[in-house]
Amino acid sequence: METTVQKKRILSGIQPSGNLTLGSYLGAIKNWAALADEYDCYYMMADMHTITVRQVPADLRRNTLTQLAAYIASGLDPEKNVLFVQSHVPAHAQLGWVLDCYTMFGELSRMTQFKDKSAKNADNINAGLFTYPALMAGDILLYQADLVPVGGDQKQHVEICRDIANRFNGIYGETFKIPEPYIPTVGARVMSLTSPENKMSKSDKDPNGCVYMLEKPEDIMRKFKKAVTDSEACVRYDIANKPGVSNLMQIYAVSTGKTFEEIEAEFAGRGYGDFKKAVGESVVEMLRPIREETERLLADKAYLETIYRSGAERASRVADRTVSKVYKKVGFLAR
């Protein structure tokens, strides 16, 4: 009699706070599509986290649907992956509150993203912005995730999640699986085209610093032509001394499959103009089918609705079991 090997489970998500960036695609979504055969994958539109910063309601709804379409267009098969909207699974809020009560003030105070977002949103430093690591821990622990795909700058979130889970398990006995960060080696952190010392972000003050997944080809090319390099005029990977060129090399490597050595040889003796044009063209061609398929999917709202409704049902079956277990452990009276 054959025994079925239980797949390890992965949970990740992106806030639908605007257009998905090239950094989101190369650093996360592109890698997710290849994981479904090996892992049990759950991917969410993290809309509850999004409202820690004020949103225009109609834009949030549109961005959430567009993000779902982009997930599917990027190769996330809804049959193989559980795709869902965070707010459609009430267990996230339920577990998030319980974990708030097992998360220390000092832990939250040390979170670097709270400091960064507080500085950028000084007129709206709300409690949700402060406690969102506890909600994020709930997102992960609800599904008893083994692995959490994150960028190198997000390891702190997995670390506090592990601390919270270990604390809860220490008090009540084994309840949560302790997750590990899953960090891809290439494309894990795409930097701004205009400030390569900073991560590419939709909140970049210079609009030319960020490329979007669904952007028009001519706009993508324009941004790459303006990308910051240096005065050396030599395509060589050196992250410390040539951050702009190294960032472009990393983008080109991921979009073409070429090694850094092959890229250096390809552009030996050629100027940065040729190099930036080639990087831009490779990104345009990589994103073209995704943009076209996203547009096609957005024209079929009924199909997308079936996907997010089914995803919420599948996610809730797992999440509700965890919440029931946690409620019993902390002493809540069963309904």
Model-assigned labels for residue ranges:
Residues 14-16, 47-49, 146-147, 204, ...:
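Short, histidine-centered active-site or binding-site loop motifs used for metal coordination
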Residues 56-57, 148-151, 235:
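Short, polar/flexible loop-turn hinges at active-site or ligand-entry regions and domain interfaces
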Residues 105-109, 142-149, 253-263:
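Short helix-capping/linker segments at secondary-structure and domain boundaries
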Residues 2-138, 282-285, 295:
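N-terminal Rossmann-like or analogous alpha/beta NTP/dinucleotide-binding catalytic cores
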Residues 116-168, 172, 192:
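Internal, conserved structured core segments that host functional sites
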Residues 82-85, 149, 232:
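Short catalytic-loop micro-motif centered on adjacent basic/acidic residues
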Residues 156, 162-335:
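Conserved nucleotide- and phosphate/pyrophosphate-binding catalytic cores
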